[in-house]
A protein has these predicted regions:
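Phosphopantetheine carrier-protein modules
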Residues: 14-33, 52-60
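Thiotemplate assembly-line natural product biosynthesis machinery
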Residues: 1-21, 72-81
């Protein structure tokens, strides 16, 4: 699978929840810009958009706090496939 770009992840996130500055945010979970329901929607979107499953061990705030960390998670999962 090709490397997933930051822009592709931002586009996916904007489909899940609009009105958030995903490009510059570094504490999406910590600042409550996204909540647990949003995280579930993001996990579902990752499955739909990239055909990847997020294991329970990776559902931690650090992986969802920034677009960069989420992009890194998605690319790691893609490499492991």
């Amino acid at each position: 699978m090709e490397e997933i770009t930051l822009d592709a992840v931002i586009e996916m996130l904007e489909d899940v929840k609009e009105g958030v500055d995903y490009r510059n945010a570094t504490a999406l979970v910590d600042n409550r810009e996204i909540d647990s329901f949003d995280i579930l929607a993001i996990i579902s979107a990752i499955d739909d958009e990239f055909d990847l499953s997020v294991p329970a061990k990776d559902i931690v705030p650090a992986n969802f706090n920034s677009t960069q960390s989420l992009c890194a998670l998605i690319n790691r999962l893609a490499e492991e496939e």
